[in-house]
UniProtKB/Swiss-Prot annotation:
Disulfide feature: none
HAMAP family: Ribosomal_bL34
GO biological process: translation
Single Gene Ontology MF annotation: structural constituent of ribosome
One Pfam family of this chain: Ribosomal_L34
Keyword Ribosomal protein listed: yes
Organism expressing this protein natively: Streptomyces coelicolor (strain ATCC BAA-471 / A3(2) / M145)
Upper classification of the organism: Bacteria, Bacillati, Actinomycetota, Actinomycetes, Kitasatosporales
Gene Ontology cellular component list: ribonucleoprotein complex; ribosome
The keyword Transferase is assigned to this record: no
Family: Belongs to the bacterial ribosomal protein bL34 family.
Source superkingdom: Bacteria
Keywords, sorted A to Z: Ribonucleoprotein, Ribosomal protein
Name of the protein: Large ribosomal subunit protein bL34
Amino acid sequence: MSKRTFQPNNRRRAKTHGFRLRMRTRAGRAILATRRSKGRARLSA
């Protein structure tokens, strides 16, 4: 039997999808801008 692929880990989650990571690149900032304009309650992890 294969293991479950999702092994929750908050630190890894933030490091991969976090706000500061999004702010680091131009593309990431574009993602945030899109989510802001859409009115998302959560911008990032």
